[in-house]
């Protein structure tokens, strides 16, 4: 007969009417009993032939992704002037006095942040914006492009101008100026009103005035290039800027000039009123030319290309309009849904390209992307705004993956010890926290996003408009992209974006100037940064508490008035160093703090209500006697594991599920096991703060017997059969707790000290977790353990009781930015008897 839930409860000693613990508990360590119970509860992981269940409630397997919904009314969030001040360290020192070396080290990590991947794979520009919403391709393209443009305008992205230069908006940092040394500019020596392009010292090139015209000739430069006589740009180009090119060494070509090896001089075919657009025809005629940035009507950063003589069309002979968008203007509409109807709505569509306020040199950056982007809801509670998801997962995959640095995440007990108090709390919201931390420009070529332009994007997604070589550039080919869907989408977008449609329809490559969210390095850097800032705040206000995890900052003070004045001072300090706070989202919690999914009060911590609700939903939908895919089990265990410390039996209760996931087997919930878990999770107990104290109760065991020292009293007992030493020590600790009721027990066993009971026989682990819940352990060496003699059967000998103080730990999540010291480097030669040599294992 299967084991019923009441019997199972009784077996686990969860009921009060159980017999004496010393007799009942050792039984749970019996292998035979554990095996029989596992068989009864169907925990044996048989190979199931019934088809697996791949969805339980909202939980799906990791490989069956939920289909996200596209919202055509998504708003792009604004990124106000986010600029972390470069003299951050100086300002912190003014605020609190000299910084500790740990604070300094952490702040230097992010000023600027650096990123060194082992290998970077470059993908074609078509993969820049992921076709994540097949029914809203065009809409998603423009919304994403608008989001990227917003980020660039906010100084969060660089725009690739040419292979070795980029432009950006916002305030420059000193390391962005240092990138150009001793460079000269090819300039007309007469310099009619045109200022020199770049001085010797500064690497930032300020924008030239819009009216500056291209000078007629180049003088003989260090390269010995002689420009042909005559105007570079034809007369039609009224608002042209200046052709700019940087020369680094006498042997190197100017940046952006790509030599084809044909030995021809430059042919600079400047197009009228629009842009210099290298379309697929250029790749077809000469594959050695890489696709590259295009030239704008304002001509601010013209890239010079050497084009083979055969492929040059002179302006006189029927020039082809090279801007795909504006080409429609002079064509006959092909249908009612021809794009030319939209293009003719406006006379002035604005420039093809925009340029930043500052120019810098960058390492060689190809016209490729290293990660795709798409939009999703900002969060489950805010579906009106969008969030940009950047997929740089290439750096976390394969043999060349980057192993990201590890950092301390506060565990539940440490967090409770730290924050469970009678303080009054508030939490601060840092807006776009990741985008505060600057990246060194050398990282830009590794973190590229962008889009290939609307024409290529649409062509790639629609099967009708395949580009054939022979008809490239013909009207037939141009109108291939016209379709009702595209027409309707663009017409709707025109109402919100206006002339920006033209700008966004051009290709663009952008590199990150601040740390992106999709790289494993970013959480580490953010955690280091906020913990250092909190450490500074904490030292400035020693009577208050400031704590952070990632971008979540909390402040605590004794009274509400005190908290408000602290809030004002801290806010002013954070704003003064350039940290942008969203003051409308400041939450005042009173005496119970909501943080990291927990509710923390003076009584301890519990999961937040929304998590309790998720647990209820999970159990309501959990099927019985049906094999559930192990990937779904992973999701279920993720939720249950979060709340496990608040249940009677804790993690050991989930061990059968963990075992099935490890074995990659389906798991079948028996009615009894489900009822057991359900009962566990419907009654949650707070995790209380550990209190300091003196240890008065000691436990010890040998494989055959156990001994206790409770104050001046000694006890001993024997086991029916010899047990593994860890099991015996765990039983002794349970007896000590049940006999004395002490919250503080001394033991010499490291496994018991760790309070992880998942490796013990399953039933014993569950029961011990409940008995020892809320108990703190102190390590006592065997030689000094007063319970050592009783465990060996000697009751007459009395060792003096130790005075063992217990101090609750806050783990590595200290309030101050302290971290373990880095071990000093050993000399190259290692002495043979050294522990380093002995402990070494082959990699």
Curated annotation (Swiss-Prot):
InterPro entries per record: DNA/RNA_pol_sf, DNApol_viral_C, DNApol_viral_N, HBV_DPOL, Rev_trsase/Diguanyl_cyclase, RT_dom, Viral_Replic_Matur_Polypro
Catalytic activity: DNA(n) + a 2'-deoxyribonucleoside 5'-triphosphate = DNA(n+1) + diphosphate; Endonucleolytic cleavage to 5'-phosphomonoester
Example of a GO MF term: RNA-DNA hybrid ribonuclease activity
GO biological process: DNA replication; symbiont-mediated suppression of host innate immune response
Positions marked as site (Priming of reverse-transcription by covalently linking the first nucleotide of the (-)DNA): 63
Reported regulation of activity: Activated by host HSP70 and HSP40 in vitro to be able to bind the epsilon loop of the pgRNA. Because deletion of the RNase H region renders the protein partly chaperone-independent, the chaperones may be needed indirectly to relieve occlusion of the RNA-binding site by this domain. Inhibited by several reverse-transcriptase inhibitors: Lamivudine, Adefovir and Entecavir.
PROSITE patterns hit by this protein: RT_POL (PS50878)
Chain positions covered by the region annotation Polymerase/reverse transcriptase domain (RT): 347-690
Chain ranges of the Reverse transcriptase domain: 357-600
Keywords: DNA replication, DNA-binding, DNA-directed DNA polymerase, Endonuclease, Host-virus interaction, Hydrolase, Inhibition of host innate immune response by virus, Inhibition of host RLR pathway by virus, Magnesium, Metal-binding, Multifunctional enzyme, Nuclease, Nucleotidyltransferase, RNA-directed DNA polymerase, Transferase, Viral immunoevasion
Domain topic, free-text comment: Terminal protein domain (TP) is hepadnavirus-specific. Spacer domain is highly variable and separates the TP and RT domains. Polymerase/reverse-transcriptase domain (RT) and ribonuclease H domain (RH) are similar to retrovirus reverse transcriptase/RNase H.
Name by which UniProt lists this protein: Protein P
Organism expressing this protein natively: Hepatitis B virus genotype F1 (isolate Argentina/sa11/2000) (HBV-F)
Organism lineage: Viruses, Riboviria, Pararnavirae, Artverviricota, Revtraviricetes
Protein encoded by which gene: P
